[in-house]
C-alpha cells in the first residue's frame, strides 16, 4: 500500500507545535501522524505493508518548514540549518514508524522527483519552485539519503522515486551514482497513477 498524500511532508509536519516550541524546535521541527493513522490501521488489520511516500520533495512541503520562525512569510533559513531540519525530520518519521509499528514500512521513497531537464539547473537538478534547492543547494537529495540510511532499520529499503523516467534515465543514474556507491540507496521507483476508470488492457 502507498498513501497518496497522508505521509507527505505537509501531512506530517506540525506548524503550530514547531512555532510554539521555539527556540527548542528551531532545528527540530515537530511532526504528527493523525493524517496517516487510518491507512496504518487498515494495513495492520489486513496484514498489508506500507510504502512511505515521500520524505523529501519540492511539492507538498510547506514553505514555513524552510523559514526562520516557521511562518509562511518568514525569511528562509541557511543551508546549515535546513540540513539539520532535514535530518531531524527524517529521523522523527522513520523512528516513529520503527518504534510504533516495527516491520510495517517495507520501503521509503526518500527523495521524489529531484531531476527535471525542463525545470532544472545546468545539471538537471530541479530548481524551479524547489525550496530544498534554494536553501540547501543542488546536493540536497544526496544529504536526504545520508540521513535516511542513518536512521532506517534494515527492513526499510530506501528508494529514489520519479515519473517519466524513460526520458531522464541517464540523468537519474548520474546523480545517484555516489549514493549507490556508498550504499545509501536500495533502488529506484517509477510511479504511475491508475483510477477505476482506466482501461489497463490498453
Which positions does each model-derived feature cover?
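Substrate-binding and catalytic surfaces of secreted/luminal carbohydrate-active proteins
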Residues: 150, 154-159, 177-182, 187-202
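Distinct, well-ordered alpha-helical segments
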Residues: 120-122, 144, 166-182, 199-202
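Substrate-binding cleft and catalytic face of glycoside hydrolase catalytic domains
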Residues: 2-18, 23-159, 163-165
Amino acid at each position: 500500500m502507498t498513501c497518496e498524500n497522508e505521509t507527505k511532508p505537509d501531512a506530517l509536519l506540525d506548524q503550530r507545535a514547531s512555532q510554539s516550541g521555539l527556540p527548542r524546535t528551531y532545528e527540530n521541527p515537530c511532526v504528527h501522524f493523525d493524517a496517516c493513522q487510518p491507512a496504518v490501521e487498515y494495513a495492520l488489520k489486513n496484514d498489508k505493508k506500507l510504502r512511505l511516500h515521500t520524505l523529501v520533495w519540492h511539492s507538498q512541503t510547506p514553505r514555513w518548514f524552510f523559514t526562520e520562525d516557521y511562518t509562511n512569510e518568514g525569511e528562509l533559513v541557511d543551508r546549515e540549518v535546513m540540513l539539520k531540519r532535514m535530518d531531524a525530520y527524517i529521523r522523527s518519521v522513520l523512528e516513529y514508524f520503527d518504534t510504533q509499528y516495527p516491520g510495517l514500512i517495507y520501503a521509503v521513497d526518500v527523495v521524489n522527483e529531484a531531476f527535471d531537464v525542463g525545470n532544472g539547473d545546468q545539471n538537471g537538478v530541479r530548481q524551479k519552485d524547489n525550496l530544498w534547492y534554494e536553501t540547501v543547494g543542488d546536493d540536497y537529495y544526496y544529504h536526504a539519503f545520508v540521513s535516511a540510511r542513518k536512521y532506517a532499520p534494515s527492513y526499510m529499503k530506501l528508494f529514489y522515486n520519479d515519473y517519466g523516467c524513460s526520458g531522464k534515465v541517464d540523468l537519474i543514474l548520474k546523480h545517484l551514482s555516489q549514493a549507490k556507491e556508498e550504499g545509501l540507496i536500495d533502488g529506484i521507483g517509477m510511479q504511475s497513477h491508475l483510477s477505476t476508470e482506466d482501461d489497463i488492457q490498453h
